[in-house]
């Protein structure tokens, strides 16, 4: 079996001790207040709150963390952002990842959305010392995280405002399964490179399941990819543009864009080349894939976005900046039509795994497509 599993945003971190513009390295020193809003490390206009959860099998103090965007307090809010939201937008991150995409929040707020993001248990803001990052044995465990988040959101926005759920990569799989189990709960589902199928051939996927089951019976916490690649050789889109590797910048106007300067990442929350991939967690993901294969019955409109091409691999190639290097984008598009009866597939030439981290023109194409689609299915 071959698994390409790095951070789902292809995230690499600055060296330990190097300050991130969002306060990344220091973000682990203080947790958000419990069941109350407090400042978030993303800066003015962003607040977070810790959501206490019931003890699970690990009994390690698992919590979730909800982040909200308040455009009125955000000096970077986009012109024309309305003061009264007309819908709720809840974002779920991917594997070895957390919410940091402030530009996504601002785009949604400009559309009239009340933007929230959820760092799931044992990820990002919710990770606590001694916990296995990202660990779960069933994706259904996140129902509690989502339930607690929605209770807090409804306390903010009321019960009449319609909900759009969004997910990136594994977060897209979690969101899809949740939407299937909760008919009538959503106005729409928006997916950014949702991980709906194990990358590689169908044979690899089929053989992988029984092997994983055997390993999981022996030791579900066993990590299967330790030392598999030198971290120094890993290509990460968040590193920014390196002229000695990437050559001349295609457009000088991009010089100050994070695509060139680098995205600000917390190294404790997005580990390079990857957090430990444990067989019990991977089995839980594959069980989710199997549910999608059987066909889901999501009742709301679904937008499934992905890159136009795939170049699986973790080391740099000229194609790495314009393709999905983490999952098979073609397989995702094929599987997406099995999510429900009304599914829109959008593919973006030049897009990377997290489409919102693509080069500036592609990013704008992604946001433009989202605006048009939401005008048709969400905005009133």
Q: What would you call each of these model-derived segments?
A:
Residues 95-96, 124-162, 362-366:
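Catalytic nucleophile-loop/oxyanion-hole region of alpha/beta-hydrolase
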Residues 342-380:
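Catalytic active-site module of serine/aspartate enzymes centered on a nucleophile-bearing elbow/loop
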Residues 273-294:
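Active-site nucleophile elbow and catalytic-triad environment of alpha/beta-hydrolase enzymes
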Residues 311-347:
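Conserved loop-alpha-helix segment in the C-terminal half of the alpha/beta-hydrolase fold
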Residues 70-119, 127-129:
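Short, surface-exposed "cap/lid" segments of acyl-processing enzymes
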Residues 298, 304-306:
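Short beta-strand/loop motif that positions the catalytic acidic residue
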Residues 170, 175-276:
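Alpha/beta-hydrolase-fold enzymes
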Residues 26-82:
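N-terminal cap/lid segment of alpha/beta-hydrolase-fold proteins
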């Amino acid at each position: 079996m071959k698994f390409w599993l790095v951070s789902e945003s292809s995230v690499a971190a600055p060296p330990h001790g190097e300050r991130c513009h969002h306060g990344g390295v220091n973000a682990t020193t203080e947790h958000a207040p419990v069941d109350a809003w407090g400042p978030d490390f993303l800066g003015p206009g962003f607040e977070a709150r810790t959501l206490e959860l019931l003890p699970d099998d690990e009994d390690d103090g698992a919590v979730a963390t909800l982040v909200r965007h308040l455009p009125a307090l955000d000096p970077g809010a986009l012109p024309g952002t309305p003061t009264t939201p007309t819908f709720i937008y809840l974002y779920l991150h991917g594997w070895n990842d957390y919410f940091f995409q402030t530009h996504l929040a601002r785009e949604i707020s400009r559309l009239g959305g009340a933007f929230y993001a959820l760092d799931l248990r044992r990820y990002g803001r919710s990770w606590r010392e001694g916990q296995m990052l990202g660990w779960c044995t069933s994706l259904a465990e996140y129902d509690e995280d989502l339930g607690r988040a929605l209770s807090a959101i409804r306390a903010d926005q009321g019960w009449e405002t319609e909900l759009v759920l969004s997910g990136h990569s594994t977060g897209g799989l979690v969101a899809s399964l949740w939407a299937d189990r909760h008919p009538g709960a959503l106005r729409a589902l928006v997916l950014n490179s949702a991980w709906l199928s194990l990358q590689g051939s169908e044979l690899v996927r089929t053989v992988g399941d029984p092997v994983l089951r055997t390993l999981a019976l022996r030791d579900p916490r066993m990590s299967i990819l330790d030392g598999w690649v030198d971290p120094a050789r890993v290509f990460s889109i968040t590193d920014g543009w390196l002229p000695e590797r990437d050559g001349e910048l295609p457009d000088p106007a991009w010089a100050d864009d994070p695509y060139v300067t680098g995205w600000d990442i917390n190294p404790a929350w997005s580990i390079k080349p990857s957090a430990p991939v444990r067989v019990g967690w991977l089995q839980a993901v594959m069980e989710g894939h199997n549910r999608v294969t059987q066909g889901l019955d999501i009742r709301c409109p679904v937008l499934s976005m992905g890159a136009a091409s795939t170049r699986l691999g973790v080391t740099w190639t000229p194609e790495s900046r314009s393709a999905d290097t983490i999952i098979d984008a073609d397989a995702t598009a094929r599987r997406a039509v099995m999510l429900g009866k009304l599914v829109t597939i959008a593919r973006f030439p030049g897009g990377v795994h997290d489409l919102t981290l693509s080069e500036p023109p592609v990013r704008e194409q992604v946001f433009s497509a989202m605006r048009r689609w939401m005008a048709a299915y969400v905005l009133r």
